[in-house]
Amino acid sequence: MTKIGVFIPIGSRGWLISTTSPATMPSFELNKAVVQQAEHYGLDFALSMIKLRGYNGPSEYWVHNLESFTLMAGLAAVTKKIQLFASVAMLTMPPAVVARMAATIDSIAPGRFGINMVTGWQPKEYQQMGLELTPEHFARRYDYASEYVQVMRDLWTKGVSNFKGEFFQMDDCKLSPRPSAHIPVVGAGQSERGMRFVAEYGDYNFIGAGGDMNQTDGARTMVAKVEAAAKQSGRDTGAFLLLMVIADRTDELAFAKWELYKQGTDIEALEWQASQAGQDTVAKEGSTAAALVRQIKNPQPTGMLKLIGSYEKVAAMLDEIALSTPGLKGIMLTFDDFVIGMEQFGQYIQPLMRSRNPNLKRNLDAA
């Protein structure tokens, strides 16, 4: 069965850079409602990003943000089954501290916690705190991340680290209590080097498939690259596709919402995004930074794959992606309106999905 998760709304406006999209204001209560809905409907995981500064522009996109680890610790205490991933901006916290934070959340939710590794791409986000995303950082960020994960894994598995690397030197560094189970590490490596990092040190790689609408075959190339990198590293790293669902009772109602959001596209925010991402002078064509710069050339509220339509149509498109993309292990959903969208998915979309209902698939195959 294809795994399904949700990328929760930890930042204002969710994932729509628009003044006419739902004015999502992040709070614990909102995210608790979304994650408890997700758990109720049998979703497999919830992931929260880390963003320390938003964009310029009237939409106030990501201007208001919660902190990822503390949010997920709270959510760990009010859920029972769903897997939870927090994100760490690696330049802001030492790996030994993050390893202890993860072990603490594991004691709240044994076996249900993981970490998303973030190297950073928006220079001003770090400059405001006296940190720099220099060209040297951009060139060596995944070397830094590799050492970071090695330190954490030392502490989680052995309770002590004497790791000696270029970026980190541990001196009888201790951690106790250790986690009750393996803590998965995930990333969103889109470049060749990023994919290699996740293949060598991660459990899953979250990928995009561009900003197209209702395209069900766009992830195949990226999934194949993730699989190739994993094979080269001798590991099985799963690819998870990020996409947005905008659904309603009919195609017409769903597309009307998208047209409304497009009317409010925040050009100033997109220009800010491009100017910040463009400072990564070592970024290559397949990288996240390159994709963010490219978005200003075709301005729209989101640069991710969008599935727009009736409940039946969205269910069919999700099945097409899940069942006809070789190597794809799962899908991570965002919604235009998270509370309504999660309810729509659980009540009307997921029950129609063969990829989520093995009995339904068997019955249809036998018909």
Swiss-Prot record:
Catalytic reaction annotation: uracil + FMNH2 + NADH + O2 = (Z)-3-ureidoacrylate + FMN + NAD(+) + H2O + H(+); thymine + FMNH2 + NADH + O2 = (Z)-2-methylureidoacrylate + FMN + NAD(+) + H2O + H(+)
Gene3D superfamilies cross-referenced by the UniProt entry: Luciferase-like domain
EC number(s) reported in the record: 1.14.99.46
InterPro entries in the record: Luciferase-like_dom (IPR011251), Luciferase-like_sf (IPR036661), Pyrimidine_monooxygenase_RutA (IPR019914), SsuD_RutA_monooxygenase (IPR050172)
Cited function: The FMN-N(5)-oxide reacts spontaneously with NADH to produce FMN. Requires the flavin reductase RutF to regenerate FMN in vivo.
PANTHER family with a match to the protein in the record: ALKANESULFONATE MONOOXYGENASE, ALKANESULFONATE MONOOXYGENASE-RELATED
Protein name: Pyrimidine monooxygenase RutA
Organism: Allorhizobium ampelinum (strain ATCC BAA-846 / DSM 112012 / S4)
